[in-house]
Structures are given as structure tokens and as C-alpha cells.
A protein has these predicted regions:
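Juxtamembrane helix-boundary/capping and inter-helix hinge elements in multi-pass membrane proteins
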Residues: 25-27, 36-41, 165-173, 180, ...
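Hydrophobic residues within alpha-helical transmembrane segments
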Residues: 4-8, 48-52, 84, 106-109, ...
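Hydrophobic transmembrane alpha-helices that form the core helical bundles
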Residues: 11-86, 90-94, 99, 240-261, ...
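Transmembrane alpha-helical segments of multi-pass small-molecule transport proteins
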Residues: 3-5, 72-97, 108-119, 283-292
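Positively charged, low-complexity/disordered segments
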Residues: 316-321
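Short alpha-helical transmembrane interface motifs in multi-pass membrane proteins
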Residues: 2, 13-15, 81, 128, ...
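TM-loop-TM module centered on a large, flexible mid-protein loop between adjacent transmembrane helices
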Residues: 32-33, 39, 70-71, 177-249, ...
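Helix-loop-helix junctions that connect adjacent transmembrane segments
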Residues: 74-77, 106-237
């Protein structure tokens, strides 16, 4: 139910946001749209909501990346891997939009191929009874609690708008970008949800056998229940890394532009508004975002931070809707 609600919400939102992005191709996204429509005070609220999302989603993804790599490199702490990821991908984005976007395209294609492989392995074992549509042990409060996690299927798709200012023919290409992104995410959302939960129930992709602690690697866990070759389990784990990298790099890319535009209006430290003259990238904004993200990582509460940031983002954006 939570997933169905989120799909409808994001389809409606994306259509509206695409129209604004094409009409106002600015790096600030929601901040610039609200500034023109409702003035600087409401623009501050919308811009802050956007930056909260862009600042606090990457730490959770970085820690997930660390947890995945820790399966292959158990001698390295996940936190060290997460901080290293921040340094590496912030560096890639500082090199400029062409480098960052080209890298993003490659890792995204690999990640999509991985999800398609997972679906091909799992869907033959799908049973609709495993989805348990009629069982709601927590009632609608459970559905409400699941919404922030369902949002992760589409999180930060609005970041497409933040690169509109650097896009050739944005009225055409931003439309194509948003449309293809939404179509891809909806299809992959259905495939991934159905082929994971639908093979043995949600418990089998959350809790490892004999444990009550939630796993950070649900797709390999799902394949283990099917007793497929360990080769495929490892391969899906590697593809999962590419998915996390694609999400992480994509949000860093959009976040740098959003913070830069926010700073141009005096709402963030002025140095964050500066563009690197050599690479033509918002280097200072990217570094500022990285520092905040690493601090969030060091708190050890990235899951709680992202859940609360999504809730507060919705609260901040509601007056602007």
C-alpha cells in the first residue's frame, strides 16, 4: 500500500516538476521556482527542504555502500569505506559536469542490468500469496511508517532539474530525462519489489536465517532462499554496489548545484556560491556538503537522520504545494 501511494505521488509530482524545470532551467530547482512564484521567504522554505534531502540522503547511502563492501572486505570498517566514498565521489564531481554525468551513466546502466538479472533469477519463483496484501499487523500506522522507505525507490529523481542550467536545449532534454527516469524507476520498482518479496515473503529478504537483525543486503539474501549458485549471489551483491554508487553520485551531483544556488541568495555561506574556474563546477558547495555528510556519518544514526529528514522535508514543502 505504501509503495502504491508513493508511485502515484511521484508520478504526479514528476509531471508537475518537469514542466517547471523546462520553463525555469535554473540550478536551484524548487528554490528558484518558488522564488519566482511566491517570493524569497517561501523560496527559503522550499530551498531548505530540498537541501535537507540532498544533504542527509547521501550519508545513509554511503553507509549502505560501506556495509556492502564490508562483505567482501571484512577487515575494513564500513564507516571508513563510507568516508572514503565521500572523498572519491566528491572529487569526481569537482572535475565537472561532463565527468560526473558520464560516470553516472556508466554505473547506472550496470546497476540496471544487475536488477534485471536479479528479476530473471527470482521471478520464476514468484507467488502472489507471498505479498500478503490482506495482512496489516500494524494497521495504517504501519503503512505510514513504511512510506519513507518506499520513497527510496524514487528518492532524488527531482535532482534532474538541478542540472537544467548546464543542459543543452533544456526544454527538450530535461523533458526526455525526467520521462525516461520516471519510466525506468517505475518498471524497476515493480520488478524489484515483486521478485524479492514475492518469492518467499518479506521476512526472508529482511532477516537472515536464525537472526532477528535486519540485513543490509536484501537482494543477495533473497537469492540465498532460492539456493541458487553462490556465483549469482556474489554477482548480485556486486551489481548492488553499482546501484548504491549511482544513487550516491547522482545525489552529490544535484546537491552541489542546489547548495550553490541557495548560497547565491545569501541563505548559505557565500563561498559555497563560487564556481571553480578550472572545472566550472560548484567545488566549494560540494566540499561543504561532503563535510556535513561526514559529520552525519560520525553520529552513527544515518537511518534515523534520513527518516526524519524525509518527514521534515514533507512538512516544509506542504505550504509551498
Amino acid at each position: 500500500i505504501a509503495l502504491a501511494f508513493v508511485i502515484v505521488m511521484y508520478v504526479c509530482f514528476t509531471f508537475c516538476y518537469t514542466e517547471m524545470a523546462c520553463a525555469i532551467p535554473k540550478a536551484g530547482g524548487a528554490f528558484d521556482y518558488v522564488n519566482l512564484a511566491m517570493g524569497k521567504n517561501w523560496a527559503f522554505v522550499a530551498g531548505l527542504a530540498q537541501i535537507i534531502e540532498f544533504l542527509f540522503a547521501p550519508p545513509a547511502i554511503a553507509l549502505g555502500l560501506g556495509a556492502y563492501l564490508n562483505l567482501f572486505l571484512p577487515q575494513i570498517h564500513p564507516l571508513i569505506i563510507a568516508i572514503s566514498a565521500y572523498l572519491i565521489f566528491t572529487g569526481i564531481n569537482i572535475l565537472g559536469i561532463k565527468t560526473a554525468a558520464s560516470f553516472e551513466l556508466v554505473v547506472t546502466v550496470v546497476a540496471v542490468l544487475g536488477l534485471l538479472l536479479f528479476a530473471a533469477l527470482a521471478l520464476p519463483h514468484f507467488s502472489i500469496s507471498n505479498l500478503e496484501f490482506g495482512k496489516m499487523p500494524k494497521g495504517f500506522s504501519g503503512v505510514s511508517a513504511a512510506v519513507p522507505f518506499a520513497i527510496w525507490f524514487f528518492l532524488a529523481i527531482e535532482g534532474v532539474a538541478n542540472v537544467a542550467e548546464e543542459t543543452i536545449n533544456p526544454q527538450r532534454n530535461i523533458l526526455i530525462g525526467f520521462g525516461s527516469a520516471l519510466f525506468t524507476l517505475v518498471i524497476l520498482c515493480f520488478l524489484t519489489f515483486s521478485s524479492s518479496v514475492g518469492i518467499a515473503g518479506w521476512e526472508k529478504v529482511v532477516f537472515p536465517a536464525g537472526s532477528q537483525q535486519a540485513s543490509d543486503s536484501p537482494l543477495p539474501l533473497a537469492l540465498q532462499t532460492l539456493q541458487v549458485s553462490p556465483y549469482f549471489v556474489t554477482l548480485i551483491g556486486i551489481f548492488g554496489l553499482f546501484g548504491l554508487v549511482a544513487s550516491f553520485n547522482g545525489i552529490i551531483l544535484a546537491a552541489g548545484r542546489a547548495t550553490m544556488e541557495f548560497a547565491k541568495s545569501g541563505n548559505a555561506p557565500k563561498p559555497a556560491a563560487m564556481v571553480n574556474q578550472k572545472f566550472k563546477s560548484p567545488a566549494n558547495a560540494l566540499i561543504f556538503n561532503m563535510v556535513i555528510g561526514i559529520i552525519a556519518l560520525l553520529t552513527g544514526k544515518t537511518g534515523e537522520i534520513i527518516t526524519r529528514s524525509e518527514e521534515h522535508t514533507s512538512e516544509l514543502q506542504s505550504p509551498c504545494n
